[in-house]
Amino acid sequence: MNPYIVLLKPRVIWLLILSSVVGYIYAAQTVDWSKLIALIAVATLAVGGSAAFNHYWERDIDAAMSRTARRPLPAGLIPEFNALVYSLALSAAGITLSFYLLGPLPGLFVALGWFFYAVVYTIWLKRKTWLNILGGGFAGNATFLGGYALGKGTVDLPAVLISFAIYLWIPSHIWALAYKYRHDYRKAGVPMLPAIIDEKKSVVIISILNIASAVYILWLYLAFGQSLLGLALVFAGVAGTVATSILALKEKSDRAMWKMYKASSPILTLFLLALVFS
């Protein structure tokens, strides 16, 4: 894959772009395809730009961790200055176009999403506190709320409640992955939760958070969803997440934690698709 594409973190940002799209479709009475295409383009630029900036800012961390050492910057595939200019150009284009093409309120959420990931998470918190992902997680809320605001023209309580499904899922997902690579994070000096506390405590916290996230998603769909097919999708994701989280609590092993990570990964996607079916 082209290293400039890798900088965008396509395997990560597609879910945030999907949350914007789902927010719009869920809120809009009818889908305006020109608005939807503009939303996808703007989200790709802004979210991809923030991801590329994260690559640039964390290039020393990536070089110190075996999982990330082959990324474009530590591997020397792209000059550092080029990566910085590329990330800022994409970000500026995405934020500017969001106000022009989508309007002030969706544009505000696009800008806030970029700010929470690129500044709050990447610059301010990542290297300083285990709360980093809790601060940066609001970028996930912003993606859904931006799409919702485009579809409805405003943001209401249901939109905020639904957006917190993303917020709760992010730390449970990231910390489960960080548990597997906790030694890498310690070596790099990054205070991710599983790298700084007792391993058994990490398992308990992450597993309970996964269960709480799954239960919250199920409640949201029962409250705001309208499709039996959607409910079936959500229930499948919830069942897999809860079952593997209970297994992790019982075994407290690396194998069980990885099973939980893999099983809980699809639940947010299933929930978002279920909202579309509604």
UniProtKB/Swiss-Prot annotation:
Q: In which pathway does it act?
A: Porphyrin-containing compound metabolism; heme O biosynthesis; heme O from protoheme: step 1/1
A biological process (GO) of this protein is: heme O biosynthetic process
Q: Which InterPro entries match?
A: Protohaem_IX_farnesylTrfase, UbiA_prenyltransferase, UbiA_prenylTrfase_CS, UbiA_sf
Q: What GO cellular-component annotations does this UniProt entry give?
A: plasma membrane
Chief subcellular site?
membrane
Q: What does this protein do?
A: Converts heme B (protoheme IX) to heme O by substitution of the vinyl group on carbon 2 of heme B porphyrin ring with a hydroxyethyl farnesyl side group.
Q: Does the keyword Cytoplasm apply?
A: no
Which reaction(s) are listed as its catalytic activity?
A: heme b + (2E,6E)-farnesyl diphosphate + H2O = Fe(II)-heme o + diphosphate
The answer to keyword Membrane applying to this record is yes
Q: Where are the transmembrane segments?
A: 12-32, 33-53, 83-103, 105-125, 130-150, 157-177, 204-224, 228-248, 257-277
PANTHER family, per database record: PROTOHEME IX FARNESYLTRANSFERASE, MITOCHONDRIAL (PTHR43448:SF2)
Entry EC number(s): 2.5.1.141
Which molecular function GO terms apply here? Answer: protoheme IX farnesyltransferase activity
Q: Which superkingdom heads the taxonomic lineage of this protein's source?
A: Archaea
Report keywords, A-Z. Cell membrane, Heme biosynthesis, Membrane, Transferase, Transmembrane, Transmembrane helix
Q: What class of enzyme is it?
A: transferase
Q: Fill in the misc note.
A: Carbon 2 of the heme B porphyrin ring is defined according to the Fischer nomenclature.
The family this protein is said to belong to: Belongs to the UbiA prenyltransferase family. Protoheme IX farnesyltransferase subfamily.
- Membrane topology term: Multi-pass membrane protein
Q: Which organism is it from?
A: Pyrobaculum islandicum (strain DSM 4184 / JCM 9189 / GEO3)
What is the annotated localization of this protein? Cell membrane
The protein in question is named: Protoheme IX farnesyltransferase
